[in-house]
Amino acid sequence: MTLITPAINSSRRKTHTVRIGNLYIGSDHSIKTQSMTTTLTTDIDSTVEQIYALAEHNCDIVRVTVQGIKEAQACEKIKERLIALGLNIPLVADIHFFPQAAMLVADFADKVRINPGNYIDKRNMFKGTKIYTEASYAQSLLRLEEKFAPLVEKCKRLGKAMRIGVNHGSLSERIMQKYGDTIEGMVASAIEYIAVCEKLNYRDVVFSMKSSNPKIMVTAYRQLAKDLDARGWLYPLHLGVTEAGMGVDGIIKSAVGIGTLLAEGLGDTIRCSLTGCPTTEIPVCDSLLRHTKIYLDLPEKKNPFSLQHSENFVSAAEKPAKTTLWGDVYGVFLKLYPHHLTDFTPEELLEHLGVNPVTKEKAFTTPEGVVVPPELKDAPITDVLREHFLVFHHHQVPCLYEHNEEIWDSPAVHQAPFVHFHASDPFIHTSRDFFEKQGHQGKPTKLVFSRDFDNKEEAAISIATEFGALLLDGLGEAVVLDLPNLPLQDVLKIAFGTLQNAGVRLVKTEYISCPMCGRTLFDLEEVTTRIRKRTQHLPGLKIAIMGCIVNGPGEMADADFGFVGSKTGMIDLYVKHTCVKAHIPMEDAEEELIRLLQEHGVWKDPEETKLTV
């Protein structure tokens, strides 16, 4: 069980208690971790074995895919086997497109997850051809209630919970017609369904508002929480960035979204959707809860920069950049220590910083500058760095802290081209207070992030959560990362990964890959790795690698191109929302993807980009 429990003066959003099997969630209970099996649900032995492994890793809740009646029936046997093993872990059934399966599996599972975009209405890619009148829209809501109410009544009668899980890319035809593919549409989709639950006095409901884009996900959860609270509906929230991807990249994407919301007091259960073995998700969830505990233990603090509406969200993302010495990009600077300047040759140090010492070419993930120790500012190796980077030492820059407000309005600050702000813990709150008070006097601000991490994953979670939250709010013009115990390449990977996932600076190819489930039609981890190797030199491009057509098209809404399993051994290729090549044999599909990129003018040969990986 997760050990993070609510403090007496917790800043967590107040939510009512929902029972899921033998477990209770809500603001009076600890935040729970969740994962999903990757086995065929009809393979009872393998599914039970994987659930047992997840329980051994302290996973609190497990979800299985239920495509149809066979999978729903399998859940009865799975639950029986779990009870026989003494495992009381709650079992959640994941439903898409098939209300009959939901009605059956409610007899066996502890919770039923439905997607309001495809529970009643077939998923429809919006083309603007169907027009809903006020009368036909009202009629479609009556049909929704008629089809959805039986599940609500059954869950209420049996004491089973439900999750209404909205996905950004799979909104219903009705919602798309009225709202488009927007935050407002996501919230409206959730409200339509909970209105039926409220009417029937059923409140064992949890919400999720998932997207593969952390900016959209954070904004949607913020807006839903605001709208629910305004109605007095204190429903719990399940947090997740859908299809986060593999390895550290997936961890960073999850932390930018989930960590930001946890620090604001939102969230009662969480899942990090990482491609690969589901047990790898739980340590990441636990780490996220540890890193955000400092915020949950504080009294509630409003975020003055919270982007509550999609309109504000868009305008903030496009805010004009300030004129800086490092141009119009969000800058990355590394603090170097004496061992960096004495343990490496100049050529080695340049390579670690992303510069080819022979050709002088820079990688997309090369920092704008470095901060050097004052005692080494005149060292020969520092002179070499000056040929490639902006080089500073701290005595050259006004260093502002929350405890030296008396100098914030000083001549030194007014005359400086930029300032450094050193935020103490809690980092997010201290930084927001600084910008709210205009402590930077309108100057470009570098946020200094100092930590003594020895572990790359822990550093990634902390930086993506705390620094990522500020990026989503549009704060600062650069970051100075002070991480003396980590290799410089790891620090740069984390820094630029956080910028990319906060939508601030696109420096690499982005992959939206699902975490695998019982619907997956090919080896996602292996195929994703191969596609990544062939396309990682195309910065700014978003490629989705999805295991099936049930979730695939709906959860890759943010992708430029999609590689989606259509049936065993076959792949469909997408451009945005449109399937352009169908049923391609798996052995030909990767070449066809490259050909598709070439046809759309986004392909470059690797040597043209000269990307240092």
Curated annotation (Swiss-Prot):
Sorted keywords for this record are: 4Fe-4S, Iron, Iron-sulfur, Isoprene biosynthesis, Metal-binding, Oxidoreductase
The UniProt entry, under InterPro entries, shows: Dihydropteroate_synth-like_sf, IspG_atypical, IspG_bac-typ, NO2/SO3_Rdtase_4Fe4S_sf
Q: Which NCBIfam families match?
A: ispG_gcpE, PRK00694.1
- The question of whether Iron-sulfur is a record keyword is answered with yes
Query: Family, per the entry?
Result: Belongs to the IspG family.
The entry's function note states:
Converts 2C-methyl-D-erythritol 2,4-cyclodiphosphate (ME-2,4cPP) into 1-hydroxy-2-methyl-2-(E)-butenyl 4-diphosphate.
The enzyme's first-digit EC class, named in words, is oxidoreductase
Under which EC number(s) is this enzyme classified? 1.17.7.3
Question: A Gene Ontology molecular-function term?
Answer: 4-hydroxy-3-methylbut-2-en-1-yl diphosphate synthase activity (ferredoxin)
Residues where [4Fe-4S] cluster binds: C514, C517, C548, E555
Provide the leader sequence positions.
Answer: none
- Pathway info: Isoprenoid biosynthesis; isopentenyl diphosphate biosynthesis via DXP pathway; isopentenyl diphosphate from 1-deoxy-D-xylulose 5-phosphate: step 5/6
Mind telling me what this protein is named?
4-hydroxy-3-methylbut-2-en-1-yl diphosphate synthase (flavodoxin)
Q: Which gene encodes it?
A: ispG
> Required co-factor?
[4Fe-4S] cluster
